[in-house]
Amino acid sequence: MKKRIFESTDTNVKKFVFEWGDQPSEKKGVAEAVLYRYGEYRKRTVICCSVMSGCPVGCTFCGTGKFFVRNLTKNEIVEQVRSCLETIDCGTRDIEKFQIMFMSMGEPMLNWKELKLAIIELADMYPTAQLLISTSAPTGMIYHLGELISFSMQIKRLGLQFSVHESTDEARAKLIPTNTCTLRQIAAMGDTWAAFTGRKPFFNYCVNTDNNGADDARRLASLFNPDVWECTLSVICEKDESVANSINRQLDIIEGFRKAMEDEGFHLRVFNPAGQDDIGGGCGQLWYFQKWLKSNL
């Protein structure tokens, strides 16, 4: 395995790139993980890691595109986290808020077998870590919700987030062309998760010029009960747009939409776009993967 580290000028964000295939026993593949520091590592540390090399889902804004190389193994997922933590200046037990999120490259629920094993190992290695699965909710997920809930009873620090991004199924299907659950099905899964686990589900919403109106906020509130759900508003740099232009434009849009969502009763958080402008630290910006594809496939 080869490992490269790219550090943002922000100094609070590092991207880790892992390449496999230089040994006869390794299958070719590349994955990216991002390490975030909020103030100090001791205060809050977040790792976003990959579950696949590439992704078959094909979200239209994502730099991974429709390219899929292979699923990552349990060991390859765990190695991303371990490598990131080698570079911080404290032990994980000293971190006030430590989060491991499966939301960099790949759809977690399409590599559930290996991800489940990785979560078990990571929960044992890092007993203070909060773990989060972020999913687009592929169609088959609805049939495996019971298994996921049962597993979450074993791993009680496991959270669940859905990539929603639009307030109607028609608009969402254009953004995420692969078959996924409907918004009502996603809402029902999250409600069930909350009822059985006692943990609030999250939905992630990428705000753009076409989905930030009061009608969007009302539709979301009618689907996702604000008393049950938490919402994250995200700045996403589309693969063909200037990062600086994207961030400035979308942060302005988010401020207006935040008020509409708060009026509907939602408790919100806004994703910090640190590291998107120079190392591609955000979703949809996996530029090293695209470069690797040109050389290897």
Regions found by a protein language model. Name each.
Residues M1-V51, S83-D94:
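N-terminal [4Fe-4S]-dependent radical SAM core
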Residues C49, N71, T180, I247-L251, ...:
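Short, conserved loop/turn and helix-capping segments at secondary-structure boundaries
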Residues V51-G58:
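Cysteine-centered iron-sulfur cluster-binding motifs in ferredoxin-type domains/subunits
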Residues M1-K28, D191-P201, Y205-L297:
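Auxiliary Fe-S-binding modules of radical SAM enzymes
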Residues K43-I47, T60-F196, K200-T209, E230-S234:
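Core AdoMet radical
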Residues R37, Q161-V164, N272-A274:
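Residues at the C-termini of beta-strands that transition into short coil/loop
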Residues R37, S53, G63-K66, C237:
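A short beta-strand motif that forms part of the nucleic acid-binding face
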